[in-house]
Structure formats: structure tokens, C-alpha cells
């Protein structure tokens, strides 16, 4: 599949970091699909969207911003989006030869509880 070097798909465009990227002027065509256009839990949907858009890069920002809070009450949402969704994006990018850039922020884990620093 021939990819467009000036096109970048960005997941999580409505989040804190993604919303900042929307304001940056640059030479790239940035696409910010919402969860209805790019359903990270549906491999076929991801493939269809990425084959249609043919981005050279995918910047993966989507995820629950406070998973520890949500994890306590809704473990399935935390696992679906942060683990399965990310795995699906990774798998399809690898299959289609799309370069994946993955970010995670400090809002994911507060650094005050458990045995990490």
C-alpha cells in the first residue's frame, strides 16, 4: 500500500495533548478521527479507515486519562481502551507499514500509590 508521507492520523484528538496538536500549524495533513470513525476495538474498522486514509504516521494518544480511578469501578473499560485498543492499533499499523508513535502521559498513573516512582 502506498502511503502519503504528509498525512498523519492522530487518535485521542479530543484529549489534553491531542487538542493542543490541533492548534499547531505545519506542513502535514493531520487527521483526528473520533471514536465513531476509528473504533479501536474493531480491527476491521481500523484497517478500513487506515487503508482509506493511507497515513505515513499514526500518533496514538487515545486512552483513559485516569485509568486507576476508572479501573476500580469499570475494569472492562480500562482494559478495552488502554490495552486492547492500543494492541489493535499497533497490530494494524504493523500490518499496513504505518509508522506508529505512541504517547502516554503522567495522568495515567499518579506516581503516589503502589510500588512505582
Describe these PLM feature segments.
Residues 2-26:
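N-terminal Rossmann NAD(P)H-binding glycine-rich loop of SDR-like oxidoreductase domains
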Residues 11, 56-61, 102-103:
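Rossmann-fold scaffold of SDR-type NAD(P)-dependent oxidoreductases
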Residues 18, 68-69, 110-111:
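Glycine/Thr-rich phosphate-binding loops of Rossmann-like dinucleotide-binding domains
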Residues 19, 23-27, 48-51, 91-95:
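Short, well-ordered alpha-helices that flank and scaffold nucleotide-derived cofactor binding pockets
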Residues 26-49:
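Adenosine-cofactor binding site in Rossmann-like domains, unifying the SAM/SAH pocket
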Residues 43-81:
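NAD(P)H-binding glycine-rich loop region in Rossmannoid oxidoreductase-like domains
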Residues 76, 80-87, 95:
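Conserved internal alpha-helix in NAD(P)-dependent oxidoreductase domains
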Residues 87-117:
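Conserved Rossmann-fold NAD(P)-dependent oxidoreductase catalytic core, especially the SDR/UDP-sugar
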Amino acid at each position: 500500500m502506498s502511503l502519503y508521507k504528509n498525512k498523519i492520523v492522530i487518535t485521542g484528538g479530543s484529549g489534553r495533548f491531542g487538542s493542543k496538536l490541533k492548534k499547531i500549524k505545519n506542513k502535514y495533513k493531520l487527521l483526528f478521527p473520533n471514536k465513531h470513525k476509528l473504533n479501536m476495538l474493531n480491527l476491521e474498522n481500523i484497517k478500513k479507515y487506515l487503508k482509506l486514509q493511507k497515513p505515513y504516521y499514526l500518533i496514538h494518544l487515545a486512552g483513559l486519562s485516569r485509568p486507576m480511578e476508572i479501573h476500580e469501578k469499570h475494569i472492562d473499560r480500562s482494559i478495552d481502551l488502554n490495552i486492547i485498543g492500543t494492541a489493535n492499533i499497533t497490530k494494524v499499523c504493523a500490518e499496513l507499514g504505518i509508522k506508529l508513535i505512541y504517547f502516554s502521559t503522567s495522568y495515567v498513573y499518579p506516581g503516589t500509590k503502589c510500588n512505582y516512582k
